[in-house]
């Protein structure tokens, strides 16, 4: 029983450490993006406000109520503040990427002056590939690039399958039709 408790304590400590590291990474990522990235944990709850018509029908179910149509239809409020915030966020994002691009061009010019232009360009390409490649596993029900273009996930003619590759290695290329 004590062994089980110890394993449970270790598991909880490991989860806390992982959560702390994930929080640190998230804060660091948001710091570098200067708050332009939306929080991944954002949840939006939609609550329906009862309309005047529903309130009237609940209060008097047996009575016939006569009222004008303007009382029954709720007034709609335009959501311009969210549109404005979205446009402002996009403007900040594009400005930030422009600053990043200008900074990269400046560093590239300095590298050219120091005769390291090609090296800088290669390292920039490697960093770009690394930071734009996802290393965590695919989320549940997430479309993969393969399934986007191949709806039924069938084998595409002309592609090398793992089974075919294994047969060719074991028995030679004549074993495959």
Curated annotation (Swiss-Prot):
<feature type="topological domain" description="Cytoplasmic">
    <location>
        <begin position="122"/>
        <end position="177"/>
    </location>
</feature>
<keyword id="KW-0256">Endoplasmic reticulum</keyword>
<comment type="function">
    <text>Ufmylation 'reader' component of a translocation-associated quality control pathway, a mechanism that takes place when a ribosome has stalled during translation, and which is required to degrade clogged substrates. Specifically recognizes and binds ufmylated ribosomes when a ribosome has stalled, promoting the transport of stalled nascent chain to lysosomes for degradation.</text>
</comment>
<dbReference type="GO" id="GO:0006515">
    <property type="term" value="P:protein quality control for misfolded or incompletely synthesized proteins"/>
</dbReference>
<protein>
    <recommendedName>
        <fullName>SAYSvFN domain-containing protein 1</fullName>
    </recommendedName>
</protein>
<dbReference type="GO" id="GO:0005789">
    <property type="term" value="C:endoplasmic reticulum membrane"/>
</dbReference>
<keyword id="KW-0472">Membrane</keyword>
<dbReference type="InterPro" id="IPR039159">
    <property type="entry name" value="SAYSD1"/>
</dbReference>
<feature type="intramembrane region" description="Helical">
    <location>
        <begin position="101"/>
        <end position="121"/>
    </location>
</feature>
<dbReference type="Pfam" id="PF10260">
    <property type="entry name" value="SAYSvFN"/>
</dbReference>
<feature type="region of interest" description="Disordered">
    <location>
        <begin position="57"/>
        <end position="85"/>
    </location>
</feature>
<feature type="topological domain" description="Cytoplasmic">
    <location>
        <begin position="1"/>
        <end position="100"/>
    </location>
</feature>
<comment type="similarity">
    <text>Belongs to the SAYSD1 family.</text>
</comment>
<dbReference type="InterPro" id="IPR019387">
    <property type="entry name" value="SAYSvFN_dom"/>
</dbReference>
<feature type="compositionally biased region" description="Polar residues">
    <location>
        <begin position="57"/>
        <end position="70"/>
    </location>
</feature>
């Amino acid at each position: 029983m004590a062994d089980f408790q110890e394993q449970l304590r270790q598991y909880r400590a490991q989860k806390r450490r992982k959560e702390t590291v994930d929080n640190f990474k998230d804060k660091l990522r948001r710091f570098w993006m200067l708050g332009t990235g939306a929080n991944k944990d954002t949840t939006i709850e939609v609550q329906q406000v009862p309309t005047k018509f529903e309130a009237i029908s609940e209060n008097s179910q047996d009575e016939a109520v006569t009222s004008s149509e303007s009382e029954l239809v709720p007034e709609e409020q335009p959501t311009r503040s969210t549109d404005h915030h979205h446009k402002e966020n996009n403007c900040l994002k594009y400005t930030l990427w422009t600053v990043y691009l200008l900074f990269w061009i400046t560093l590239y010019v300095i590298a050219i002056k120091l005769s390291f232009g090609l090296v800088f360009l290669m390292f920039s390409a490697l960093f770009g590939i690394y930071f734009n490649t996802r290393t965590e596993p695919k989320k549940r029900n997430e479309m993969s690039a393969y399934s986007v273009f191949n709806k039924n996930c069938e084998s595409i003619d002309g592609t090398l399958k793992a089974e075919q590759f294994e047969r060719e290695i074991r028995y030679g290329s004549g074993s495959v039709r």
